[in-house]
Every structure is written in structure tokens, then in C-alpha cells.
Amino acid sequence: IVNNNINNSLLWLRRDLRLYDHNALFQALRKSKAVYCCFIFDTKILEKLKIKNDRRIEFIWHALKEIKEDLNNIGSDLIIEIGDPVILIPSLIKKYKCSALFLNKDYEKYAIERDKKICNALQKDNIETYKYKDQVIFEEKEILTQNNSPYTVFTPYKNNHLKKIFNEGITQFDCEPYKINLAQFKNKPLQSLKD
């Protein structure tokens, strides 16, 4: 079901650097008239890197370059910023007149705390935040013992995990038919890694 009740929305890419089989993108495209995609190089994470030219940054840069090219080919673009997402996300929401933020969940402690700050700030401005499961098959409370507690023994957990996959399958999110709802705009060029 497509329900474009949101005019503009912002999709925040993080660990999920792709435009296919992407839960938050799929949901944003189905619920929004125009979706702006962004990625933020979080300076609080970058500052912790011991090596300035870390290979992970190079990998991310190449993935962003590919995403930007794919978006450019269909008249859209990728917003890439460097800074604190707690400041930048609300700023981008205002700049692009978005009424919703879509993102896939991140399960790291720092990310959970950061995302909570962002959601609270957006909520004050009546901006909806939609978070989706993406980087895991099952979240921590989706596979529990019969007592509704986490497993402490691996084999019963594994058996339940496999049974659940067999019974429910793994959902895939076909974004292609909805990419017409990507915002049509041109953003600044991608900076080189040296910049």
C-alpha cells in the first residue's frame, strides 16, 4: 500500500550504504512525495580513529560516490555533511522542509544515545521519526525462550532462530518501483578524500 501523506522526508543513511533492499528507504519512498537522502560523517566517530587515512573511511567514500552517481542518474542527489548529526539532522530537516526523518536502527551504544537526542529535538518541532530494523535478521526481543527471556544456551537459540527464518522468511524491500519519489534536486559535488 502506497500512502504519500508526507510531503518531504529525509532519509539518513548510516551503516546501510545502498539504495536496494533498504527498509527505511522503502518505507520513506512509499510514505513520502519527495525523499531527500543524506549521509553524515559524524565527527565524534571520526575523532576516535587512530589513523587519519583509515580504510573504513575510504570504503564509505567509495560507497557514497556510487550512491551519489546512482541518484544523479535519476535526477536526485545525495546530501553529504561532516559534523555532529545532533545539529545537522534538524538543520537539514528545516533546509529541505521535511516533516519526517526515516532511518534504519543502529544498535551501538553511542548511536542509540545520539539517535535519542535527535528524535527528542525533532519531536519538539513536531517532526516524526521512523526507525526500522535493517542490519539484523532478528532484534533482541524477537527470539525469546518460552518464559519471554533471552536464551542463555546457544543451541536452543539457534534452533529457534532457524525455525523462525524457515516459517517467516526474510523480508526484502524492493525500492525500485518507488524511486520516482526521490527528491529531484542537485547538490554540491562529492569532495575528494584529501579534502
Residue ranges of each PLM-predicted region?
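Glycine/tryptophan-enriched, flexible segments
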Residues: 150-195
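Trp/Phe/Arg-rich N-terminal binding region typifying the photolyase-homology
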Residues: 1-166
